[in-house]
Amino acid sequence: MRLEGKIGVVTAAGSGMGRAGAIRFAKEGALVGVVDVDEDAVASVVNEIEKNGGKAKGIVADLTKDADSKRIVTETAKYFNGLDFVWNHVGYPGPASVEGVEMNDFDLTLDLNLRTILITTDAALTELRARGGGSLLFTASTSGLAGSGFSPIYSMAKFGVVGFVRALAKRVAKDNIRANAVCPGPIDTPMLRVFVARPDQQSTVGMDKEDLVKKRGGVGPMGRPGRPEEVANAALFLLSDEASFVNGIAMPVDGGITA
């Protein structure tokens, strides 16, 4: 198994890509800290993992809180006696415009895309160094590679994630720690459907909900949205020893949108 005996944390693991990743990693032998703000969703993922013979620790956390962003690392490491990887998957789409932006929403976008990953990374580095190395994975986006007129503030934040990953990779490589990002395009998740159904998205592009879902999910050469499992597969590779010389990349998983 590709993550046999590895101990890791997955944030926003209650649904979509995070859920798919946590379940897949456990099937590949990882011991997984399953993190989400939704207690029922955490319990569901842990149950699914354990039903299939895997091991998981459910952690309910609000990652807008600095203490929780640190606690998810220390709690997982204490429970499983170590830490080998973190997938910082949590994010927030933010406002659809740059005009009349509510600054509370702007702050939340930065908190859930940037601030929390800094705090979690800080805590994780101590644990990874104690293990002699490890892997840090971050969810950016194609919006952090090419920008998106649908979500300019989100693009701002995700460009920040990509920049952080590239700089971090150079800084921690000496400690046998790799840092990479996965950059999903439109993926058919609950978050995508909630996002495109928002009134600010519909007014921005002048489409009703169903047309907008098709537009956001059907663009690109492959003509369909991705599946959460397809992103989880890429994440698995980047976290595994198969990617032992892969460091500092931002890997698109987008069906060719950024080709």
Cite the ranges covered by each PLM segment.
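Alpha-helical segment proximal to the catalytic Tyr-Lys
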Residues: 126, 170-174, 244
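Active-site helix of classical SDR
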Residues: 121, 157, 165
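Short, small/polar-rich loop/turn modules that mediate ligand/substrate recognition or access, typified
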Residues: 87, 173, 178, 246-248
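Canonical Rossmann dinucleotide-binding motif of NAD(H)/NADP(H)-dependent dehydrogenases/reductases
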Residues: 3-33
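Residue(s) in the substrate-gating loop at a strand-loop-helix junction
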Residues: 141
